[in-house]
Design a protein with these regions (language model features):
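Bacterial N-terminal signal peptides
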Residues: 6-14
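Positively charged n-region of N-terminal signal peptides that target proteins for export
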Residues: 1-4
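Acidic, polar low-complexity intrinsically disordered regions
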Residues: 104-108
Length: 318
């Protein structure tokens, strides 16, 4: 009898333990996102998880092009991808991996430094070209093959060359300090904070989030103004495509961040719920506080394919 009792008792514990483990398991939503979204994304996730204790949002940052290649080349599981350039999702992921994307925020290219940067008191929207070309000044930029901030930096230099009529400016700047190119724009912040570099081309939102000194550039070159889009589209660059050895052409454009849920998302329903919160007033207020301007109403090229929960954000607010 004692043996039978022990067997029944231990079996009961085993099944009780299994039931407890399954019921307590969180839903995990995987988000690949641009490095420049790290700060607002973390804050949005903190708020969402307070309201949904049974859901865990797993954030993984990288350059947007790298985020896309994790899906197309490495076949890594992912629910949501948020890119700093809508072009990345449209060109590399639609239609094979997702059918739609929503453009939800903008930004602008600035030149950022700190109080220890050489000639910081002389830096302005006219002098920056001469200062950054000085032999004793080191500047850094993101990799154009990994991060849209990288090719946008080169676009800004090309547009500055035209705007200021400085023949050869872009080529000189691109060839300078190449050892300080990094995979994503937020990697540049560590170089500045350690005083390894003096300046960097950066998104305004990242400069604000890290309390950096920065100068704004004319709208004809900072990629922030849709009314100047014809000017922006006058420059282009070939960058690494979705397969090794393949190049794709990227054309200058007004900065548009975009986001989507993948067709094969492991937690598609919960991913859409999270996206509903992120794109809602509370989520967008967090972005705005962090210097990331929402584009309201949001836009899409695939209105008929957008999940029904998100359609309300594509209309003009009343």
């Amino acid at each position: 009898m004692r043996q039978i009792f022990l067997f029944i008792f231990s079996s009961s514990l085993l099944f009780a333990g299994c039931g407890s483990s399954n019921s307590g398991k969180s839903k995990e939503v995987i988000v690949f996102h641009a490095g420049s979204l790290s700060v607002p994304m973390k804050q949005v996730v903190e708020e969402y998880e307070k309201m949904h204790p049974g859901t865990k949002i797993l954030l993984e940052s990288a350059g947007s092009l790298v985020c896309a290649r994790k899906i197309t080349e490495l076949k890594k599981p992912c629910d949501i991808i948020a890119s700093s350039d809508y072009f990345v999702i449209n060109e590399l992921l639609i239609p094979e991996y997702t059918k739609w994307s929503i453009r939800f925020a903008t930004n602008e290219i600035v030149i950022a430094g700190n109080e220890k940067s050489k000639y910081i008191d002389e830096l302005n929207s006219e002098s920056w070209m001469d200062i950054l070309q000085k032999n004793d000044v080191i500047y850094a930029r993101a990799d154009p093959n990994s991060d849209p901030c990288g090719y946008r930096t080169i676009f800004t230099l090309m547009l500055a060359e035209k705007f200021y009529n400085k023949t050869g400016l872009a080529e000189k700047m691109v060839s300078k300090n190449q050892e300080y190119i990094r995979p994503k724009e937020v990697d540049l912040v560590a170089l500045l904070e350690s005083n390894t570099i003096d300046y960097m081309f950066q998104y305004k939102s990242v400069a604000i989030q890290h309390g950096l000194k920065y100068i704004e550039l004319p709208k004809e070159m900072n990629l922030s103004d849709p009314s100047n889009n014809d000017i922006y589209k006058s420059v282009s660059l070939d960058v690494a495509g979705n397969k090794p050895g393949v190049k794709m052409k990227v054309t200058g454009d007004y900065i548009n961040y975009s986001i989507t849920v993948l067709d094969e998302a492991p937690q598609k329903a919960e991913a859409i719920n999270f996206l509903e919160f992120l794109l809602g007033p509370e989520g967008m207020n967090i972005f705005k506080i962090n210097g990331q301007e929402p584009i309201i109403p949001f836009s899409t090229e695939e209105p008929d394919l957008i999940p029904s929960k998100l359609l309300k954000y594509l209309k003009e607010p009343k």
